[in-house]
UniProtKB/Swiss-Prot annotation:
It comes from Arabidopsis thaliana (Mouse-ear cress). Controls the flux of glucose into the hexosamine biosynthetic pathway (HBP) leading to glucosamine (GlcN) content homeostasis. Involved in regulating the availability of precursors for N- and O-linked glycosylation of proteins. Required during pollen maturation and pollen tube formation by triggering polar deposition of pectin and callose in the pollen cell wall. Promotes tolerance to tunicamycin (Tm), an inhibitor of proteins N-glycosylation in endoplasmic reticulum (ER). The active site is at C2 (nucleophile). Pathway: Nucleotide-sugar biosynthesis; UDP-N-acetyl-alpha-D-glucosamine biosynthesis; alpha-D-glucosamine 6-phosphate from D-fructose 6-phosphate: step 1/1. The keyword NADP does not apply. The keyword Repeat applies. Homotetramer, may also exist as homodimers. One of its GO terms (biological process) is UDP-N-acetylglucosamine biosynthetic process. This is Glutamine--fructose-6-phosphate aminotransferase [isomerizing] 1. Pfam families: GATase_6 (PF13522), SIS (PF01380). The gene is GFAT1. Its EC number is 2.6.1.16. Keywords: Aminotransferase, Carbohydrate metabolism, Glutamine amidotransferase, Repeat, Transferase.
Amino acid sequence: MCGIFAYLNFHANKERRYILDVLFNGLRRLEYRGYDSAGIAIDNSSPSSSPLVFRQAGNIESLVNSVNEEITNTDLNLDEVFYFHAGIAHTRWATHGEPAPRNSHPQSSGPGDDFLVVHNGVITNYEVLKETLVRHGFTFESDTDTEVIPKLAKFVFDKANEEGGQTVTFCEVVFEVMRHLEGAYALIFKSWHYPNELIACKLGSPLLLGVKELDQGESNSHVFQDAHFLSKNDHPKEFFLSSDPHALVEHTKKVLVIEDGEVVNLKDGGVSILKFENERGRCNGLSRPASVERALSVLEMEVEQISKGKYDHYMQKEIHEQPESLTTTMRGRLIRGGSRKTKTVLLGGLKDHLKTIRRSRRIVFIGCGTSYNAALASRPILEELSGIPVSMEIASDLWDRQGPIYREDTAVFVSQSGETADTLLALDYARENGALCVGITNTVGSSIARKTHCGVHINAGAEIGVASTKAYTSQIVVMVMLALAIGSDTISSQKRREAIIDGLLDLPYKVKEVLKLDDEMKDLAQLLIDEQSLLVFGRGYNYATALEGALKVKEVALMHSEGILAGEMKHGPLALVDENLPIAVIATRDACFSKQQSVIQQLHARKGRLIVMCSKGDAASVSSSGSCRAIEVPQVEDCLQPVINIVPLQLLAYHLTVLRGHNVDQPRNLAKSVTTQ
């Protein structure tokens, strides 16, 4: 759950100032992945001498200020030009060791910084490796699992040189290090023993390579002809390594998604990809695994997507982008017309697998956090239109229990990033058990997109804010379309399906309408600014809305908030109700409306402070038994109502966070892409 970045220029004159700016901006683009500490390493004036390493607790700007201060104190020449240079950078979300400079990356092999490493992931056997290295005379300064990696590289390097013979290559050192590592990782190695060279490798954590050829136009069709693509030549180039594409798009759209077990060697203006043949990237001794032929792909992203534009925060921007993101999600997938004037759904990524899904014994939805809530919101319509039992699994719980998954099951994995560690473990488990695996992600080329048999890209656009907003609503829409596609062979539900398709086509306009509640939700946030807790009651389709709304308030406003199934109110939660506790009840018109009216009456009877979300025109009826604050929203098809109903709660969470003085886009202790267990 960290962000790693690297920049290497070859035969291209770049000032130290420019190199620092590239590294800092790369970290800024990755900061949503972690922001409790950061660090960089750049070349000294002589690349064959110890590099300059800067590490700092706090966010990226704390690192920038620290580096600028050190530059001032040491008279480091920012105008010095480098024809070749290799720099690495890291922004951290702590898993081992508190946020502090000694625990920040790059982690070092020891005095002299022979080897430096930036790491995203978790090394599960680091304690065993640490004990071994201590017995060989190494001392440790940090509390991190990462520190064993550069020290192990130094141990391998020293041992190989002591034994004599041919000089060990950087790749061979990294191969031997990987042979001893267990866990999930994306790593970038730098060493002054191997100037102007970087090594990257990964197993279970995301990593991409970006390539920019400075003397040629940015061609979108360039294909690597062999394992030594962009082979050694004198053409000026820039190479970038990053945890995700957000840090690459401003530099290049030529990218390569690095696969598990692959080692990428950037050297002499060329790129080599090598892959271990043995399971989990293991090989025996200092051997050279097989080369791999790969092709560049084109990054479908624009710089504007990762900027705030006219908004103060990414979360605010992404909430207000939902009419456009929903339109993009549905574009080309809803078909109206034809000889019979029928209305259908076309999901190209699933069309060859729909018959298999329809024959499934059950459909299992697997996700974490917001993605789980989106699947929960869609479960009723999936059961209704498919006639297949639908079960829900939190990914970590399924993995812990090793719950039964069968060959006759369809397992649907929902993840915005496509890299969620717990979801990936559950995916591997489902594949081993023979289930058809379907991926629903927002990231083309992500691990889930590659490992599943088929899937749907939600096309919500880049989501930078840690608290997911537009991805949630797009996930619901995709899963409603999935239900329509699965049930498309059932004549009895045709009118229902066509009504839902009409509702989907109208949905962006309804969301635009509900966004007009922005000022009203800001006023409500002002009333709740000093509260310590908030309960949210929902039922049916909107139980998921209650969970997701409470999660948003919890994540960013740092207020205790709990989403509660209204049918369970009498089984404990009612004991919390008094005249001081604010309670939100979602009571829009659907099959559960009369039951929610009863809930409102019972809460009024206990003098509860109620905020009721209702359909337009229902404010008087929901508050007839007592005073409450009513929020009226447009009414749509019941299975689409969660998309409408979550928007006011997203706005409430946003304004509550701003008014309470917290960081909206970087909530305490959280990161966007949860790539560690």
